[in-house]
Swiss-Prot record:
Region listing for Disordered, in residue ranges: 1-24
Basic and acidic residues bias: start-end ranges: 8-22
Organism (species): Frog virus 3 (isolate Goorha) (FV-3)
Protein name: Uncharacterized protein 054L
Domain of life: Viruses
Length: 76
């Protein structure tokens, strides 16, 4: 999945990596939509499209996901 998202998306201006090192918003959205929702109901801006909507499991694995994403994208 990340590999497909990476194709044609290397323009940092259009899809910037945030200062805290989190992946581009598009990638986060795709992961969050597939992740189990937080049962406590911490809703973000738009249903399921930001990290705040993800389950704690996603937060625990976030660095691993990011590492995989950057190695596939060659974004370093």
């Amino acid at each position: 999945m990340p590999l497909r998202l990476c194709q044609g998306r290397k323009d940092r201006a259009s899809d910037p990596v945030r200062d805290d090192g989190s992946p581009p918003r598009l990638f986060v959205s795709q992961v969050c939509r597939r992740a189990p929702k937080d049962p406590q109901g911490f809703q973000g801006h738009r249903g399921g499209q930001n990290v705040g909507d993800c389950s704690p499991i996603f937060h625990q694995e976030k660095k691993q996901v990011m590492r995989r994403f950057y190695s596939l994208c060659e974004w370093k």
